[in-house]
Amino acid sequence: MTTLMVQGTTSDAGKSTLVTALCRWLARQGVAVVPFKPQNMALNSAVTADGGEIGRAQAVQAQAANLAPHTDMNPVLLKPNSDIGAQVIVHGRAVTSMDAAAYHDYKRVALQAVLDSHRRLSAAYRVVMVEGAGSPAEINLRAGDIANMGFAEAVDCPVILIADIDKGGVFAHLVGTLALLSESEQARVQGFVINRFRGDIALLQPGLDWLEQRTGKPVLGVLPYLMDLHLEAEDAIDVRQAGKSAEVLKVVVPVLPRISNHTDFDPLRLHPQVDLQFVGPGQPVPSADLIILPGSKSVRADLAWLRANGWEAAIQKHLRYGGKLLGICGGLQMLGTRIADPLGLEGPAGESAGLGLLDFATVLEADKQLRNVQGRLLPEAVPVTGYEIHAGVSTGSALARPAVQLDDGRSDGAISADGQILGTYLHGLFESPDACAALLRWAGLEAVQQVDYHALRERDIERLADLVETHLDTAKLRRFCGLGG
């Protein structure tokens, strides 16, 4: 069994994308490959088949490997809930919240969890394809590292280093990163991949020749810039949109300081009839057909931010003029009358008044709800699939008019008596074509085109595997994977 690791010179260098591409490239050949990320820091997460929580990038990589997501694919997930702290999730379950200093001391425990997961995957699959985090050359983070070279040294695996040429300085990034590694770590780097190149490759060739001569390591290939690649972002909100038709529905989403699972909105970005706008701090709230309150890792703090930025008055005005309002997970909790956090799970213990638009209250509890679900989205009763990731338990009379009837017999969320407001705990509901179309009709779009988001994602994964075939040295890659030339 072989482990191969992809590390990057910076965040957003293309690590997730390359691991996704390599997983599908190997799966096409019938190789049993599994994705793995030792430690991930992200607020976008997915629910696994075994009832845990991992980064969404690893869920996409699992799809590329033709596997169901599993907690061993991302044994340590850090979900920031303040500027200096994060909720620590190990093997899919929340352990506690820690500040950076406390987590540094906890890393020995985290490393053991990482190695346990890697050992299980190595026993079950031919190739473990590993994604690093950020950069391996962050001097202040190297002590006790479990995400990059610390992991590679622990399991004795080779490394590919990827860099993004589109941002400039690619040769400085690669040479500088290599120079900051120890001799044993430098020896692990088997070669380089340059990502997001546009232009004439012949003009780049002298630089590639210099890089190989300077470092003694091969350039494994140059991946082109793909203008319309729309895989789910791991951290930053992707604001690119597909081309729009003449008739569009205007949808507005506030960029909360602790917004979570903003990948919920990717299907809307790609929908030809939706004009999606993310609104940040200090920006005026534009007129819209639909306002969506997204998920949040710190609901009470983000609700205070909404009020401070004028959103409460803007929402009231929006509703007075007939606009629709949707709350998802933390956004649902904000719609109620009260949010209580007696245990201090998301910040200082206490409670906050909600927006008071639906008659229910929420109490945050230590036992987080994690499940994949399916059911019927009301009032049209169209099929919907999604997933729940929340610590809140909501109760109140508004829940007697649910938004979703789940197949397991439970009901979820609420719809206001006048039909203007809908709230649900379900993430991912826009990925269901029928549910997405029903929500767009509810928001005022008459003739809705159905878009199969899963088919679009599968198409992009296939395109990435094609790039491996045409632009990378596949003979060397096969050798790194222990498969021969």
From Swiss-Prot:
CDD domains: CobQ_N (cd05389), GATase1_CobQ (cd01750). One of its GO terms (molecular function) is ABC-type vitamin B12 transporter activity. GO terms for biological process: cobalamin biosynthetic process. Gene3D superfamilies: 3.40.50.880, P-loop containing nucleotide triphosphate hydrolases. The active site is at C329 (nucleophile), H427. Keywords: Cobalamin biosynthesis, Glutamine amidotransferase. SUPFAM superfamilies: Class I glutamine amidotransferase-like, P-loop containing nucleoside triphosphate hydrolases. Belongs to the CobB/CobQ family. CobQ subfamily. Catalyzes amidations at positions B, D, E, and G on adenosylcobyrinic A,C-diamide. NH(2) groups are provided by glutamine, and one molecule of ATP is hydrogenolyzed for each amidation. PANTHER family: COBYRIC ACID SYNTHASE, DETHIOBIOTIN SYNTHETASE. This is Cobyric acid synthase. It comes from Stutzerimonas stutzeri (strain A1501). The gene is cobQ.
